């Protein structure tokens, strides 16, 4: 079975850009385990996933110029080799993410931890780019989620009276030629173990390319047990990163945001669509950028980003970021309601300019348009 696909670059250059096609699920698809995308340039595997009456086909657009149109053929397959794809492997209380047998990241979920987090996070040169529990801030856990005032409970720090984020169960673990995905349920609790709210975390690790790789990170918070106030504090982030010491501004690295702000002086407490942190690691320039989704509350986010290595998307700390403006950043979730925060993390080679971080953000918020023809 084959379909024709037409992809339109639109007003932007595209490079290693994820594209997903959604079709109504039909019984004739039940024996298909994968798909292949054919074009004049060659062929590539696509990832197929079924979900609630639909079927999703995902692949990567290698390169398209502004205004370009490309035609592809989609062919479903009954069998797909997993040799060169993404894989998930369990190591006690960690889920390892691998590509072609090489580790990219590990999701740490032990219930003894203060919070689940991702560490290590391997950069495009094969070296970890994040720090886990540095001495100056032991609660900074590589790539993590936390908030310092949840109905008055500190779920940011790691002290005796701090709250915690506790792993409950995995809802989904899947891997294929294009991405691996972890979906997990966590419960935020106070220091007595009493539940504050429920969290669904969805993390998609995209196949590495020659420019680096993407990680899509989505957090949904539900006020299951009562009304929730996420208080006004700078010690919070629905996505936070702590880079390795050698990447920090203090060691010669740089922070750049979407408005051209440079380093902490021009980016801390400022709003921006994205923020990038890069520097030299073992003789090679690498970086990590966070892209804020346009669908997120209070987009574009404020940034709690420091020359010593912290980068956090924080929409809450307005009394700190907007001193004297009479503004507060408290965020209320009424009982039974849910709020979602989505980000793309771009782990890249080179500087902000070298990696064309701004163009890759456009791929995230304004992806190419796709037509499917039977």
Regions found by a protein language model. Give the residues of each.
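Alpha-mannosidase-like glycoside hydrolase catalytic domains involved in N-glycan trimming
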Residues: 1-85, 107-185
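Short, well-ordered beta-strand segments enriched in hydrophobic/aromatic residues
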Residues: 5-7, 97-101, 215-223
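Beta-strand-rich recognition/accessory modules
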Residues: 50-64, 291-374
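Short, hydrophobic/aromatic-enriched beta-strand segments in well-ordered soluble domains
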Residues: 69-78, 184-186, 201, 217, ...
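An acidic-aromatic substrate-binding cleft motif
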Residues: 83-108
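Acidic, contiguous internal or C-terminal segments within carbohydrate-active enzymes
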Residues: 88-89, 184-233
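Surface-exposed beta-strand/loop segments enriched in Pro/Gly
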Residues: 127, 137-160, 264, 274-331
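Active-site/ligand-binding surface loops and adjacent short beta/alpha elements
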Residues: 227, 233-302
